[in-house]
Design a protein with these regions (language model features):
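C-terminal-most transmembrane helix of multi-pass membrane proteins
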Residues: 2-3, 42, 46, 243-299
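Hydrophobic/aromatic residues within transmembrane alpha-helices
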Residues: 30, 41, 84, 110-116, ...
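Glycine-/small-residue-enriched transmembrane alpha-helix faces in small-molecule transporters
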Residues: 1-40, 72, 79-80, 125, ...
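Transmembrane alpha-helices of multi-pass small-molecule transport proteins
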Residues: 34-76, 100-105, 156-160, 176-193, ...
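Hydrophobic alpha-helical transmembrane segments of multi-pass membrane transport proteins
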Residues: 14-26, 56, 69-87, 107, ...
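Specific alpha-helical transmembrane segments that line the substrate/conduction pathway
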Residues: 40-43, 47, 82-115, 153, ...
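Hydrophobic transmembrane alpha-helices of multi-pass small-molecule transport proteins
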Residues: 53, 74, 116-136, 153, ...
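Membrane-interface helix-cap regions at the ends of transmembrane helices
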Residues: 2, 48-64, 79, 127-143, ...
Length: 299
């Protein structure tokens, strides 16, 4: 294994996962209380991310691409997650979201010609088991519409990720996705305002800031890096490694907030790491062309 070649890739993957975990914490803080509603949170998040990427693209003189399906998947993920998270809560939401992500991306891997081995399947199941152990005590019987909504959010994120495998210009594609997703969010907000006859309550500054930080800092740059990484990773590995996000959130609470490390968190973390490790075996990265030496699996 060429450690020098794999360290940058592993480091960038870790940055993406930590960014996703930070985004999860921001959304939890913003949507858990009355500071901001899901429609406005989604709007500010996507518009904030679009503005950051548009400025970056203008500086780099990268033209805006035509809208593609990935822009819709990004919008659907952001909107469905925001609306259903309010009802489901963190534990049930995480379980349903990442289950749908796994199923969608494994299906995408098969459709794309990848052939997961037994170790990949066992790894994915182990990581899912770790996630279940982490959230099991907080599960409840949710509203059926919220379950469907969160599964739709997970499927949309899975499709958005699968759609990034063949991207050659991550900045151009991510900017386009955010710009057109933001336009869809503006349309959604206009429909909601029209249906209600105007805003019902004014958002609090804290909620607006959390949505803006979520979009401009922990969404747009992180998703750009994710699109830069996806062509270098096997879809199976990319799907399974995301199951570590709730575990990172748990350990982040220990490091930053002084929350205790419970036996459930430790066991869940171990299972997720074991599962991710199994999906890294031999096929952590996409197979290279015959004339190109295949890089090693990141570790």
């Amino acid at each position: 294994m060429d450690l020098k070649r794999n360290l940058p890739l592993a480091g960038m993957t870790l940055v993406v996962l930590v960014g996703m975990a930070a985004n999860s914490l921001l959304e939890r803080a913003g949507l858990a209380g009355p500071a901001i509603g899901p429609t406005l949170f989604t709007l500010i998040r996507l518009v904030g991310g679009a503005l950051v990427l548009a400025v970056w693209s203008a500086i780099r003189r990268v033209p805006l691409k035509r809208p593609q399906a990935n822009a819709f998947w990004l919008f659907l993920y952001a909107a469905a997650f925001s609306y259903t998270y309010v009802v489901l809560g963190a534990a049930m939401g995480a379980l349903l979201l990442f289950f749908a992500v796994q199923l969608t991306m494994f299906t995408g891997a098969l459709a794309g010609g990848e052939r997961p081995t037994a170790s990949h399947i066992v790894g994915g199941l182990l990581a899912l088991a770790g996630l279940y152990i982490l959230v099991a005590l907080q599960l409840h019987r949710p509203a059926p519409w919220a379950v469907v909504g969160m599964l739709a959010a997970g499927a949309a994120w899975g499709l958005y990720s699968v759609g990034g495998r063949g991207v050659r210009d991550p900045l151009a594609h991510t900017t386009s996705n955010f710009v057109y997703a933001a336009l869809l969010a503006i349309g959604l907000a206009a429909l909601r305002l029209s249906a209600r006859g105007g805003p019902q309550t004014m958002p609090q500054l804290s909620g607006v800031l959390e949505a803006l930080i979520s979009g401009a800092i922990t969404s747009a740059p992180i998703y750009l890096l994710w699109y830069a990484l996806l062509p270098k990773l096997r879809t199976v590995f990319a799907a399974t490694v995301q199951l570590s996000v709730p575990v990172i959130v748990g350990f982040g609470g220990w490091m930053l907030l002084g929350e205790p490390v419970t036996a459930r968190l430790a066991i869940a973390g171990a299972l997720v790491l074991m599962g991710v490790g199994l999906t890294m075996r031999r096929t952590g990265q996409k197979a290279s062309r015959p004339d190109t030496p295949a890089p090693d699996t990141p570790a």
